[in-house]
Curated annotation (Swiss-Prot):
Family to which this protein belongs: Belongs to the peptidase S28 family.
Disulfide bonds: 213-370, 231-308, 262-341, 362-392
Protein's gene: Prcp
Glycosylation site residues: 99, 315, 334, 343, 413
Residue stretch(es) of the prosequence: 18-43
Record GO cellular component, one term: lysosome
Organism: Mus musculus (Mouse)
Protein's recorded name: Lysosomal Pro-X carboxypeptidase
């Protein structure tokens, strides 16, 4: 399962802030080139189907519809005593998530499960207005988590009616990152449709100021600090060195040469350069996996440790420090050694839709981020909701409603719900906005000591640490109980 699929939440660079205020870039957002091509060795067998959904589930006058894509794999499904594992698609092409959520495929036989992967509206092929879907805010008005959850509910009802044996089977929602948030909210809003949910790396408390805005970047910094004694200090010092050199034409040329950039730097590009570097450190924290895998380029096991091999001394000369930064960046962008230069427009992956997530980040999904340069290794950046709101209005003609998600889903007041697993990797910066303590006996937290961004949803690997192996066993244990309780209650 390629690492490319797992940056499910990145950042929305509205403006030129170098410390990356939220853009949960769409995970899809990241801009690679074309849609991802799965590794043939892990390609999955499934049927591609479409279901006609209402554009607006919450009004009666709008009769427009669109086709939602979904994937079904039923190799291990049993009509008697089986279950349905339902992936709540997030901000990207559903085929990508299908091919990169190996956990579901690994447990399908044990749970006698049909696998269903539902594409999120406005992503992949599930475009309500075709090529006009992102034309303006009027066309994007139906891109909300509430509408997406209603799509999932309607699709499950359709499956129960049209697949013999599906009706009367327990459905479990599974998702990671934004998809994990949706899985949790799906169980909260539609408990009569799904018996439980696995919400992996789901930062449901990153919203509405429920956690300190600097928590995310502190965790990123701690990942680097733990991987090398002077690693984070070297990165922190690099910002001033970049500023110093960018003040002259010769300095800009030196920066271009030392960092082996594909195009010459100008003073106007310095914020872009800094944002690109900062985003690289963030992405490394999310994909800090215990085995080698393929992201933009091949990545080694524990890539931050590899990065920190080059960042051992912050007190070297400016030129040497930048040369070390280049070597560190090359771990992420050129580990294979095949790239002739580094392109600062290249970030994460392209299979996710940046335009769709950009709109969501400007409406419902408002996640405050900040840095102070003391508790973290980034330049100071203050969260400014007014500026953020104005930037959103300039881009989309809408202003965010930062408190709406708390109103809709309860914020931290969710103890009345049940049967939700919140799993978080302690290395994952999104864990700062996740549920990391049990709320009740049935709202449980599983913390993965050596886990990065939803490592537990990845396919089994011989190099998996014991912490993720245990987490998966616990997750399956809870699911089996939900399934058993379901069948016990209908007898």
């Amino acid at each position: 399962m390629g690492c490319r699929a797992l940056l499910l939440l990145s950042f929305l660079l509205l403006g030129a802030a170098t410390t990356i205020p939220p853009r949960l870039k769409t995970l899809g957002s990241p801009h690679l080139s074309a849609s991802p091509t799965p590794d043939p060795a892990v390609a999955r067998k499934y049927s591609v189907l479409y279901f006609e959904q209402k554009v607006d589930h919450f009004g009666f006058a709008d009769m427009r519809t669109f086709k939602q894509r979904y994937l079904v794999a039923d190799k291990h499904w049993q009509r008697n005593g089986g279950s349905i594992l339902f992936y709540t698609g997030n901000e990207g092409d559903i085929v990508w998530f299908c091919n990169n959520t190996g956990f579901m495929w690994d447990v399908a036989e044990e749970l006698k499960a049909m696998l269903v992967f539902a594409e999120h509206r406005y992503y992949g092929e599930s475009l309500p207005f075709g090529q006009d879907s992102f034309k303006d805010s009027q066309h994007l008005n139906f891109l909300t988590s509430e509408q997406a959850l209603a799509d999932f509910a309607e699709l499950i009802r359709h499956l129960e009616k049209t697949i013999p044996g599906a009706q009367g089977q327990p459905v479990i929602a599974i998702g990671g990152s934004y998809g994990g948030m949706l899985a949790a909210w799906f169980r909260m809003k539609y408990p009569h449709i799904v018996v439980g949910a696995l919400a992996a790396s789901a930062p449901i408390w990153q919203l509405d100021g429920m956690v300190p805005c600097g928590e995310f970047m502190k965790i990123v910094t701690n990942d680097f600090r733990k991987s090398g004694p002077y690693c984070s200090e070297s990165i922190r010092k690099s910002w001033n060195v970049i500023d110093k050199l960018s003040g002259s034409g010769s300095g800009l040329q030196s920066l271009t040469n030392i960092l082996h950039l594909c195009s010459p730097l100008t003073s106007e590009k310095i914020p872009t350069l800094k944002g690109w570097i900062a985003e690289t450190w963030v992405n490394l924290a999310m994909v800090n996996y215990p085995y080698a895998c393929n992201f933009l380029q091949p990545l080694p096991a524990w890539p931050i440790k590899e990065v920190c091999q080059y960042l051992k001394n912050p007190n070297v000369s400016d030129t040497v420090l930048l040369q070390n930064i280049f070597q560190a960046l090359s771990v992420y962008y050129n580990y294979s050694g095949q790239a002739a230069c580094l392109n600062i427009s290249q970030t994460t992956t392209s299979s996710l839709g940046s335009m769709g997530w950009s709109f969501q980040a400007c409406t419902e999904m408002v996640m405050p981020f900040c840095t102070n340069g003391i508790d973290d290794m980034f330049e100071p950046f203050l969260w400014d909701l007014e500026k953020y709101s104005n930037d959103c209005f300039n881009q989309w003609g809408v202003k965010p409603r930062p408190h709406w998600m708390t109103t809709m889903y309860g914020g931290k007041n969710i103890s009345s719900h049940s049967n939700i697993i919140f799993s978080n990797g302690e290395l994952d910066p999104w864990s700062g906005g996740g549920v990391t303590r049990d709320i009740t006996d049935t709202l449980v937290a599983i913390n993965i000591h050596d886990g990065a961004h939803h490592l537990d949803l990845r396919a089994h690997n011989a190099f998996d640490p014991s912490s993720v192996l245990l987490s998966r066993l616990l997750e399956v244990k809870h699911m089996k109980k939900w399934i058993l309780d379901f069948y016990s209650n209908i007898q």
